[in-house]
Amino acid sequence: MHDSEIFKFKDMMMMSCTVQTLVLVPWFLVVFVLAGGEDSSETTAMFPAMFVFGDSLVDNGNNNHLNSLARSNYLPYGIDFAGNQPTGRFSNGKTIVDFIGELLGLPEIPAFMDTVDGGVDILHGVNYASAAGGILEETGRHLGERFSMGRQVENFEKTLMEISRSMRKESVKEYMAKSLVVVSLGNNDYINNYLKPRLFLSSSIYDPTSFADLLLSNFTTHLLELYGKGFRKFVIAGVGPLGCIPDQLAAQAALPGECVEAVNEMAELFNNRLVSLVDRLNSDNKTASEAIFVYGNTYGAAVDILTNPFNYGFEVTDRGCCGVGRNRGEITCLPLAVPCAFRDRHVFWDAFHPTQAFNLIIALRAFNGSKSDCYPINLSQLSRL
């Protein structure tokens, strides 16, 4: 990374650290992450591995291998990633879990679909996330192939078989118990299901409250399946403020400076249930004695950034850096489209996804933030348990 880029991000991060709730992270660590974490394989990782289950916010290439419209394996996606080439990540650069992995001292973990033919290191973790995937099986079906939460858990079982071949049974048990699980799902169940009444019946069958209950029930089932496989350290990311993304601003013709509150309220209904789930699992006689579940308040952190953008170095909060139409969110980033010039000043990269600059802030808050960012503890604290 060039010195000018480092100082630009340093100014942004120091401002956010002094003004907002982000706990100050040592500057050498921020430089290390921004530089790509090249030495992560030579450091002692805070977790032996990280396993990621999620959607396009954390997909690092799985959908490249699927017959899906939800793919980002073309420029300008990846324009700020190493090599300036697309990887299947839905951003101009790194995702939140890319940054989290570097903060934890882990090497870049592979997409599940890149591991199926063997020859890839899976012992530091695997990413199962799939763009358009949701908690519900039918979510995102209009976009083609994708891995739902249930399917991602099934894919993990294949990885576990491979891991079990290389370790003794007791070693596998210890490895699983110490590894980190990151789950980021639920966004598509709204934007690619409930909020598309012409394609899905869910909004005519369920009111927002009962739909949130349905999501939580299915989510809990799959989460406990992962617990049953032996995982003991979980971070569960909440749904973001979907009423503020360019796609919804354009679709609902939101007034300048406003979000679609009805959509945000739906997201909060689900998030409130996730917090209650975390509390319940952390107090349950069985799970609480063996495991810890953490809620990542991505909603609150995102609202903070959108409300106080200048404190974080952002200037544009209501339109994508790459996209077409109102709010640059009616049509998402197309192949070889020309993105905005100052990408680090934009919260949103395209109609649905944030920029690398936004992802870095969220990752830092998850890593070393207060209880308002990660509840009941942050990732740094979780690693010491």
Curated annotation (Swiss-Prot):
Keywords: Glycoprotein, Hydrolase, Lipid degradation, Lipid metabolism, Secreted, Signal. Residues 1-35 form the signal peptide. It comes from the Eukaryota. One of its GO terms (molecular function) is hydrolase activity, acting on ester bonds. The keyword Secreted applies. It is found in: Secreted. It is an enzyme of class 3 (hydrolase). InterPro entries: GDSL, GDSL_esterase/lipase, SGNH_hydro_sf, SGNH_plant_lipase-like. The keyword Lipid metabolism applies. Pfam families: Lipase_GDSL (PF00657). Glycans are attached at N218, N285, N368, N378. Its main location: secreted. The active site is at S56 (nucleophile), D350, H353. Its EC number is 3.1.1.-. One of its GO terms (biological process) is lipid catabolic process. Gene3D superfamilies: SGNH hydrolase. One of its GO terms (cellular component) is extracellular region. Belongs to the 'GDSL' lipolytic enzyme family. This is GDSL esterase/lipase At5g08460. It comes from Arabidopsis thaliana (Mouse-ear cress).
